Amino acid sequence: MSLATTNSVAEIRARNKELIEEVLKVYPEKTAKRRAKHLNVHQAGKSDCGVKSNIKSIPGVMTIRGCAYAGSKGVVWGPIKDMVHISHGPVGCGQYSWGSRRNYYVGTTGIDSFVTLQFTSDFQEKDIVFGGDKKLDKILDEIQELFPLNNGITIQSECPVGLIGDDIEAVSRAKSKEYGGKTIVPVRCEGFRGVSQSLGHHIANDAVRDWIFGHIEAEGKPKFEPTPYDVAIIGDYNIGGDAWSSRILLEEMGLRVIAQWSGDGSLAELEATPKAKLNILHCYRSMNYISRHMEEKFGIPWCEYNFFGPSKIADSLRRIAGYFDDKIKEGAERVIEKYQPLVDAVIAKYRPRLEGKTVMLYVGGLRPRHVIGAYEDLGMDVIGTGYEFGHNDDYQRTAQHYVKDSTLIYDDVNGYEFERFVEKLQPDLVGSGIKEKYVFQKMSVPFRQMHSWDYSGPYHGYDGFAIFARDMDMAVNSPIWKRTKAPWKEAPSAKLQAAE
């Protein structure tokens, strides 16, 4: 049993505050003062977690954040399957992020779907000196010739494009006209913009607003027959099939899903979304901007949902149903009742094996709070959590609805801090990303990737909860931990004792 579960709330709070002070001692005074604003111990009743967020990382620290290009191309636009997404700039940005997110989709790759292909303009020195617009023009022609069934193209700008002032908007307009009105979207997501991938999400949302919705209004399309029960899934990237498992529940309760943004999504679905009666928002951080725009422009309400774990699934189904008539409300209750035997079986099997185990999380802009309920459904206790690129409203939601008193909170935590926190709090499981995975596994700490589900999933929905429970049990109770132990679980060697 971890040390964190053996003390009172007051003792845990005091210990966590001491831990923060201890971690900050290694920094120069100015750096320590800045980092102190990002670390805190949550106090019950507070409206937020008491940390600063969405601020530039300190130069020289090993931040775990990404850039605006990653937020736009890697998160929002990349999963749109029937569009070609050009990484416009040097080859490295696209190459080293190629296929790193498991955005499942239906289609024939290279024919009518292009998610897992890497398109790059491969900038060279001469392109920096003389500009890359002519090269971009040629690339667009090549794409049209080689992939004639693509339904649109996005141009995802990398850093040099913004620095040299290329006019990708003019190229996009000219080529769109040349191709008979084809959708070509320039996205100014150069990596130097903003403080993290979060601004890339915002820029991508704005590109949808200006280059997709703007053209729909002007051209009077799409032609779409609405029903009273049309909804759009917003901010689900179909990691491991998450959006599909969510869609099943929505359709079983009587709703019609007319669009998925953007996992397994298409250009036609983006264009159809202004006809929805409700936008249901999964990843608030990356897609709240376009959801708010559609509410203001088209009068479409939106609500957040959380399909991690049965408790949150039931809450979300009822919240969504509240926007519709009794038919949908009855459908929600029917779905909850249908899956209750599955939930009972999963909890009966895995909760005894996971009860009381402690977890520390550090993920992107949503999962540090959304997955907490699923862990609690299994009897596990989240003792620390934080966001790579969360904003203040994310920490408000976390404080008001998810974390317990005395939980350790860390914003934009760096490699050093996270390792020290784990060493001191000694969790039974860490959930974070690929960069952290092997560090903690080498420390003999059970670990699960909470960005890509460690090549498992889906984790959304009732079926996903069964997979989630199995994977957490597999990580925590693997036989390998009988052969290797975390440093704090090993008896000190005679040599170390002599040295002391």
Curated annotation (Swiss-Prot):
Cofactor(s) the protein needs: [8Fe-7S] cluster; [7Fe-Mo-9S-C-homocitryl] cluster
Pfam families on file: Oxidored_nitro
Keyword set, alphabetical order: ATP-binding, Iron, Iron-sulfur, Metal-binding, Molybdenum, Nitrogen fixation, Nucleotide-binding, Oxidoreductase
Catalyzed chemical reaction(s): N2 + 8 reduced [2Fe-2S]-[ferredoxin] + 16 ATP + 16 H2O = H2 + 8 oxidized [2Fe-2S]-[ferredoxin] + 2 NH4(+) + 16 ADP + 16 phosphate + 6 H(+)
EC number(s) recorded for this UniProt protein: 1.18.6.1
Chain residues that bind [7Fe-Mo-9S-C-homocitryl] cluster: 283, 451
GO terms of biological process kind: nitrogen fixation
Highest taxon of source: Bacteria
Cellular component annotations (GO), alphabetically ordered: molybdenum-iron nitrogenase complex
Binding site for [8Fe-7S] cluster: 67, 93, 159
InterPro entries: Nase/OxRdtase_comp1, Nase_comp1_asu, Nase_comp1_CS, Nase_Mo-Fe_asu
Coiled coil location: none
SUPFAM superfamilies, per database record: Helical backbone' metal receptor
Cofactor notes: Binds 1 [8Fe-7S] cluster per heterodimer. Binds 1 [7Fe-Mo-9S-C-homocitryl] cluster per subunit.
Protein family according to the UniProt entry: Belongs to the NifD/NifK/NifE/NifN family.
Subunit structure: Tetramer of two alpha and two beta chains. Forms complex with the iron protein (nitrogenase component 2).
UniProt cross-references to NCBIfam families, sorted A to Z: N2-ase-Ialpha, nifD
Protein name per Swiss-Prot or TrEMBL: Nitrogenase molybdenum-iron protein alpha chain
Lineage: Bacteria, Pseudomonadati, Pseudomonadota, Alphaproteobacteria, Hyphomicrobiales
